[in-house]
Amino acid sequence: MSFSSEVKKELAGQIGNARHCQIAELAALLIFCCVVRATDGGDIHIDYESEHLDVTEKYVTLLKKLFHISPEIIVKPDLRRRKKEVYQVNITDRSLAITILQLVRFLSDSEDFAEDVPLAHQVILNRSCCRRAFLRGAFLAAGSVSDPDKSYHFEIVCTEENLADQLCELMVELGIDARRVQRQKYAITYVKGSEQIADLLGMMEARVMMLQYENSRIINEVRGNINRKVNCETANINKTANAAARQIEDIELIENTMGLSKLPNGLDEMARVRLQYPTATLSELGDLINPPVGKSGVNHRLRKIGEIAERIRTQGGSIRNG
């Protein structure tokens, strides 16, 4: 599996709890993966297609959470790529299609399509968390990121120039130095800087892959600048990054099953601080806890969190405290 596919796999498993963020992410998937068409009989259909099963399953999950429906995923051969498959989801009920399009502000209450439809309605992107959710959806639908061991490149492919321009503006608002370029018939919004790409992965909540990206980036810098120290530095970086990635995975498992609020007293704060500061050292994490604790205290709490996560894996679900 490519680095980009691994990022998408992690992001596909991230379902925000806030309804407004779910709407923003769905809006992006609709823009980049769907075709809205009116039939001769006056019906409105929403046709979704993607080559990624994980992304398609997330699209269905968002529809289920927002509209309480479970549409079928249709698997078909991709005629453009041999030995590949595409995944389709078709909404053919006119009333449901209108409800979906109105929720994401593609249709007005009078069921009219707006001319020169923007990237997404300003109401949907009003909150910074929703802008990040929208960016996550856009990347899942039409984005890619190169393996940091080969190059530093992040891009989202748009079929229209105005969409690429607006997406570029959105990323700039989030503090990312995004650029746009034309590639044949496609408009590409892209980012080159390694630190900026790492920030993007963090914004989209690909925390584990962000740590792997940072790990690779730091290793590459060490190799290029201080060759004689590579072996020692690599071992330390790998140890720290792998430990942090494992902790993030444990916390996300708990968050998606029993919920962080059900952790024993003191562990819930530790879990939230680790999620918020995935690259922080044990000492730095200890300073962020109220009241502050030492490295041994942080290590003890993270170990307890790991034990709870392991019990969840063993039992195959959420567990009760104690």
Report each predicted region and the residues it spans.
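Short, hydrophobic/amphipathic alpha-helical patches that form generic packing surfaces
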Residues: 24-32, 133-141, 272
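Short, solvent-exposed alpha-helical "recognition" segments
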Residues: 302-317
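DNA-contacting interfaces and partner/effector-binding or oligomerization modules
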Residues: 57, 61-81, 90-214
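Structural motif
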Residues: 15-24, 124-131, 261, 265
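Extended mid-to-C-terminal alpha-helical interaction segments
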Residues: 199, 203-300
